Amino acid sequence: MFEIKARDAMGRLGVITINGKKIETPTIMPVIHPNPKKQTVSMDLINKMADVVITNSYITYTTPELREIAETKGIHELIDFKNVVVTDSGSFQLSVYGDVNVGPMEIIDFQEKIGVDVGTILDIPTGPDVSREKAESDLLETFKRAEDSIKRRKEMGYKLALNGTIQGSKYLDLRQKSADVMGKMDFDIYPIGAVVPLMEDYRYREVAEVILNSKMHLPTNKPVHLFGCGHPMLFALSVALGCDLFDSAAYALYAKNGRYLTADGTLHLEDMKDLKNFPCTCKVCSEYTPKQLFNLEEKEKTRLLAEHNLYVTFEEIDRIKNAIKEGNLWELVEERCRSHPKLLNGLRVISKYMDFIEKHDPVSKKSGFFYTGYESMNRPEIYRHKQRLERIQYDKIYVTTVSENTSKPYHENLDNVPCDVDVLIKDSVFGLVPLNIDTMYPLAQNEVPDLYDFEKKYNNEFVSNFMEKNSEKILDISTYNYYINHYGTKKECDKINPDVFRVGKMLEYQYGAKILDDELMEKVKTRRSKNTGRIRNLLLEKEVLFTLRANDNFLIPAKSGAELLHEKLEFPKYRIVIDSSVEEYARAGKSVYSKFVKDCDPELRPFEEVLIVNSDDELLAYGTTILNGLELMEFDYGVAATLRGGLKK
């Protein structure tokens, strides 16, 4: 069972529950050698740091003394780990040696027998440089083994959860096919396999595309494991692309070669030995100088270096979790991807997939938008803004520029005559910013440095296309000046309540429909904050319809506002339909759980304001969705939406 608690980009801070044990994602699974004598880092430390580990059932199976202990006492006792134990099936050995001495069903039976929490099918790992024919042949065999493994578990009544590995080599259409076929089987976790050769060769562009083409076709309610990814420099990008789990033997393997992991690369202990201190404050680096550690006996040096590597690995995971909660994961990704040019290739290629990524990215975040480089132009926040500009119902448009020194929000620093013209400001980052919505996230909640000329030109084509599409509504400067002078001389501006007009446009941008018709425009009023002087509420006959949330200026409906949205928005827009059995709980304002969702607006994005209705489209409650439209239909565990209020019968 998997539940999302917080999110940013496609990263998910969630909880996986397996056999009553909980794993917080994203997380790393340290690789544990099934032979305790060969384990580099003590299991006491592993037990303190990890919720889940991964070990090798094939080595256990083929080593008589290990097999005997595992079969009599269980895998947890063998490796001395109390929480979730995942096992590989021998697929790695198959990829290295070309053959293994165990059958696909035999290894499933063994993993169940030794009490594994999550087992893995014996899939066929297919490296990136094989022919397409070979990749297709291997994939068909993996499908057969997967189907047989699922059938075996069901027929035998096995309790273990199963990994269904996605294969397909470098062929993206085969990755899609693999995800489609495997995704229809009842697997619990979906590892993306055979990417280690790509990572070893710094082919991060291909890694990113393999992840995305797999994610696009996998069920959203299952965790995704990036098999073999153990270097912390890759975690942020991989999490942003939707990976929940990683496994690492790197902490030990690198230590044996004297390599010192950091969050943005790898150093060599020998090259560091003349430094006064380590660039790290973990327990190992605090107790030893580089020279002291370098001069230790080899076995002890390896153990301590492995401990540092493990510390820095978990530290990066914790940093990513915090970035998800704070809403600045993209900034961390952009920072990490500048640690190596090939990693930057991985970041740049994802712009091709922004239509998919945007569907999973929250509409609002705790942190503002920080522009850290040219790649920021392709962030989902900007992509979404450009799309949602088309939601606004324009009558007359005037496009202009402002001085680079003009502070945001623009409308507070410009002498703008109130009228019914939509004034759009050319913006180097966001393309076009309508003055009437310029306080909404992320248009005012951003920090951008001085830009190079080529960056300033990035949106020229977008602006030209917008103006061409709306050419009949565009006013040139002479027409615009005449128009506003006409309003000024005839005092027509008295007929326009600029605050109400503004809120009407904000509602169009947020909800995609004209919520305030002409009749309502004359009846509603706004109320400004006494402290900030900014619009705070929209009221109808002294009753609050909407409140403008201070941090992002989104319009949050009160009960009457929810009723107005329900009236103005056609079904199923901004709706979540719930089962009749939980109507009373929704009316009482209690959270909506995923398993009770029957239908929804498929275009919903995470953290949008939603209407909770029954199958007859009767309004029951209103609140905020945690999941997007696809997830709402696929998740069957955890909270789907938190409610602000319910409507009593």
Curated annotation (Swiss-Prot):
Keywords carried by this UniProt record: Glycosyltransferase, Metal-binding, Transferase, tRNA processing, Zinc
Record: active site: 88 (nucleophile)
Positions of substrate binding: 123, 194
SMART domains, alphabetized: PUA
GO molecular function, one term: zinc ion binding
Catalysed conversion reaction: guanosine(15) in tRNA + 7-cyano-7-deazaguanine = 7-cyano-7-carbaguanosine(15) in tRNA + guanine
Co-factor requirement: Zn(2+)
GO BP of this protein: tRNA wobble guanine modification
The keyword Oxidoreductase is assigned to this record: no
Record-linked CDD domains: PUA_archaeosine_TGT
Occurrences of domain PUA (ranges): 573-648
E.C. number: 2.4.2.48
InterPro entries: ArchSynthase1/Queuine_TRR (IPR050076), ArcTGT_C1_sf (IPR038370), PUA (IPR002478), PUA-like_sf (IPR015947), PUA_sf (IPR036974), TGT-like_sf (IPR036511), TGT_C2 (IPR029402), TGT_C2_sf (IPR038250)
Physiological role: Exchanges the guanine residue with 7-cyano-7-deazaguanine (preQ0) at position 15 in the dihydrouridine loop (D-loop) of archaeal tRNAs.
Family: Belongs to the archaeosine tRNA-ribosyltransferase family.
HAMAP family given in the database record: TgtA_arch
NCBIfam families per UniProt: arcsn_tRNA_tgt, tgt_general
Protein name: tRNA-guanine(15) transglycosylase
Gene that produces this protein: tgtA
